[in-house]
A protein has these predicted regions:
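UBL (ubiquitin/ubiquitin-like) substrate-recognition surfaces
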Residues: 1-482
Length: 482
């Protein structure tokens, strides 16, 4: 058993230095070729020195470093034979996806719904997909452990590329292998030998952390642009202005610091019924820490306000807590309502609120204008333009405090390490069209279905929310000659 570097010829194309590990099943090698060529595994025929590779074994198939293998197979969608009218209820999920141009689903490879749901939600950020497309490099199996963030970034890029080429369900074999290599605890197996269910939000935060290390920041010609070290910091980074005041002595001066996060947390308590109040309740809390003045642990009031908003706001409902007796992350099922349009103005510092006001005024002007046009039945100009959602000196920020719900990651079950995770995504920005991505099945759903994900029972229950910047579309006066 060994690792080899081979070349693969496919028609007029040639893939150089593809790594093959014969300790892994051939399907993993085929998944790499699928990522490179788009040829589904079941259509691949791989030959070397007069032998054809079997799907389940390397037996009789000899490899050497630098040898060239021949692959045959088409990456084009097979035309559906004309069998007359086929009704929706008779269609398979793949046929339905193809018929309605739905995005590709992801095959569940054994309790991998936590990963599939995370991948589908993050795919709903167009700027992230573009940043991944700009990222160079090929996956090198041998260097996964020395460059884990590089391997995660490349394998996610390649997976999205494959998903964009098809409407059939995609088996994310290569990405799962990399995820397991980088985070071995995600590869834990049950007594029955299958993969154990994992926490989807942990998968989400680990992917964001890996991408943060690799995706470079976008740059402009302006010297005034606030410097961020990564694309993730620009588009997902939240900054808090935090003040710590000791409750037990007036001799200790207040401490002001800036904290950075990629998620907001909505803690769930008996009196919390709405997302906004859950977020607001954590802005002021009492903590215990060492007091340099008193020389002992003391109580402090920690007051936090948002000083920088990202374009994409991620919010986690803290629904799981550890039950010592059962040794399980048990779930809080409480119903917490969340809105389609979120306004976080009240959570922001006074300095940020002042910066947000000009764009908020424009939103108000446009709403009033459209209300009057509707009242007077005047047609709204067709020549519309979208105003920037970010401050000119801060790429990837939000300049209004207004957000639109883009994706919901849900959990159904009673603990984070069991049950089932699903992604619910807005099909297109600004449109009230939603999709439920349940592993390989993708279904059309309504906004009413989305709002029913607030919890309170054994139905799918919101665990992570992804909000995108609410766009302001105005008439382009340069083109408007009315």
């Amino acid at each position: 058993m060994a690792t080899y570097s081979v070349h693969v010829k496919w028609g007029k194309e040639k893939f150089d230095n593809v790594e093959v590990n014969t300790a892994e099943p051939p399907e993993l090698f085929q998944a790499q070729l699928f990522a490179l060529s788009g040829v589904p595994i079941q259509r691949q025929k791989i030959m070397g020195k007069g032998k054809t590779l079997k799907n389940d074994s390397w037996d009789g198939f000899t490899l050497k470093d630098g040898m060239t293998l021949l692959m045959m197979g088409s990456n084009e969608l097979v035309p559906t034979p004309q069998l007359g009218t086929k009704f929706i209820e008779d269609m398979s999920s793949t046929e339905l996806n193809k018929a309605s141009s739905f995005p590709a689903g992801l095959t569940n490879l054994g309790n991998t719904c936590y990963m599939n749901a995370t991948i589908q939600c993050l795919k709903n950020v167009p700027e992230l997909k573009q940043a991944l497309e700009r990222y160079d490099g090929k996956l090198n199996i041998g260097s996964i452990m020395s460059m884990p963030s590089d391997a995660i970034t490349i394998s996610l890029r390649d997976l999205y590329n494959v998903m964009n080429k098809t409407s059939a369900a995609v088996p994310p074999i290569m990405f799962l292998q990399v995820l397991h290599a980088v985070f071995p605890h995600f590869a834990e197996k049950s007594e029955q030998g299958g993969f154990m269910q994992q926490d989807a939000n942990e998968c989400w935060t680990q992917l964001i952390r890996m991408l943060q290390q690799r995706l470079p920041p976008l740059k402009t010609d302006s010297d005034s642009n606030l410097h961020k070290s990564s694309f993730i910091d620009q588009y997902f980074g939240i900054s808090f202005k935090t003040v710590l005041k000791c409750d037990e002595t007036d001799l200790e001066a207040e401490t002001t610091l800036t904290e950075h996060f990629y998620q907001l947390s909505c803690f769930i308590s008996q009196d919390i019924k709405y997302l906004n109040s859950g977020l607001k309740s954590r802005l002021k809390e009492t903590i215990t820490k060492a007091s340099p003045v008193l020389g002992k642990d003391a109580l402090y009031t920690k007051s936090s306000l948002i000083s920088r908003l990202p374009a994409y706001l991620t919010i986690q409902f803290v629904r799981f807590f550890y039950k010592e007796k059962e040794k399980v992350n048990a779930k809080i099922l409480k119903d917490i309502k969340f809105p389609m349009t979120l306004d976080v103005f009240e959570l922001c510092s006074s300095e940020l609120q002042e910066k947000l006001k000009p764009m908020r005024d424009k939103f108000k002007e446009e709403e009033d204008k459209r209300a009057n046009e509707k009242l007077l039945q005047i047609s709204i100009a067709a020549n519309n333009k979208k105003l920037p959602f970010e401050f000119s000196d801060d790429i990837g920020s939000n300049n209004s405090g207004y957000y639109e719900l883009s994706a919901v990651l849900t959990h159904r079950g009673r603990s984070s390490s069991s049950g089932h995770y699903v992604a619910w995504i807005r099909k297109q920005e600004g449109l009230d069209e939603w999709l439920m991505c349940d592993d390989d099945n993708v279904y059309a759903v309504t906004s009413e279905d989305i709002l029913k994900l607030s919890g309170g029972g054994d139905w799918h229950c919101a665990y992570v929310l992804l909000y995108s910047p609410k766009s302001l579309i105005v008439a382009d006066e340069k083109n408007d000659h009315h």
